[in-house]
Amino acid sequence: MYEVDHADVYDLFYLGRGKDYAAEASDIADLVRSRTPEASSLLDVACGTGTHLEHFTKEFGDTAGLELSEDMLTHARKRLPDATLHQGDMRDFRLGRKFSAVVSMFSSVGYLKTTEELGAAVASFAEHLEPGGVVVVEPWWFPETFADGWVSADVVRRDGRTVARVSHSVREGNATRMEVHFTVADPGKGVRHFSDVHLITLFHQAEYEAAFTAAGLRVEYLEGGPSGRGLFVGVPA
């Protein structure tokens, strides 16, 4: 999903654009403790470069991250040299321990292709949950909330670098096809450009809820969330 160039500019761009990882982690911690007051451990699934995990660790102490991309994990290890980080697939990972909370942020579950894969992922989340624990998932847009043809454009200047990002998103079958272009300029490397295409599944709300239910979780959908796409919260039924 993410290659070296993406991982290199990922944090710089989103931090420069104003994404507040600390506030988001604090809000998720409050949500977790509203369901599980004694929560003391957390697993961050699809942790990326560790920007949320860094702040989750301040909230819980006992944390771990799971990430599929080795490039992202390389950056996460630099950011969090003492963190417990695993390379693995959210659909079938087995870590041999359980957590008070299992969370997946930034709509990472949208990269799953089918309801079967979504169900397998949520079942893996539930498999790693302590009795009385909580699962929190930030979804991608639903079919009825996705804005077909959406164009996003931002320029970020940070740490001597300038990053311009433009994207165009259209509906393709049951997915969002997002074409993303980055132009990066810095004094040492000059100007470079890269692009890629993301296919992000437009699962229905009911399909998320069915995955939670099949995993033995009682599920609630909360509107809003960090990016306006809401949050699914599940506790053992």
Curated annotation (Swiss-Prot):
It catalyses: dTDP-3-amino-3,4,6-trideoxy-alpha-D-glucose + 2 S-adenosyl-L-methionine = dTDP-alpha-D-desosamine + 2 S-adenosyl-L-homocysteine + 2 H(+). One of its GO terms (biological process) is antibiotic biosynthetic process. S-adenosyl-L-methionine binds at residues 21, 46, 67, 89-90, 105. Pathway: Antibiotic biosynthesis. Substrate binds at residues 14, 17, 145-147, 152, 165-169, 229. Pfam families: Methyltransf_25. It comes from the Bacteria. Keywords: Antibiotic biosynthesis, Methyltransferase, S-adenosyl-L-methionine, Transferase. The keyword tRNA-binding does not apply. One of its GO terms (molecular function) is S-adenosylmethionine-dependent methyltransferase activity. Its EC number is 2.1.1.234. CDD domains: AdoMet_MTases. SUPFAM superfamilies: S-adenosyl-L-methionine-dependent methyltransferases. The keyword Membrane does not apply. Belongs to the methyltransferase TylM1/DesVI family. S-adenosyl-L-methionine-dependent methyltransferase involved in the biosynthesis of desosamine, found in certain macrolide antibiotics such as erthyromycin, azithromycin, clarithromycin, and methymycin. Catalyzes the last step in the biosynthesis of dTDP-desosamine, i.e. the N,N-dimethylation of the 3-amino group of dTDP-3-amino-3,4,6-trideoxy-alpha-D-glucose. PANTHER family: TRANS-ACONITATE 2-METHYLTRANSFERASE (PTHR43861:SF1), TRANS-ACONITATE 2-METHYLTRANSFERASE-RELATED (PTHR43861). Homodimer. This is dTDP-3-amino-3,4,6-trideoxy-alpha-D-glucopyranose N,N-dimethyltransferase. It comes from Streptomyces venezuelae. The gene is desVI.
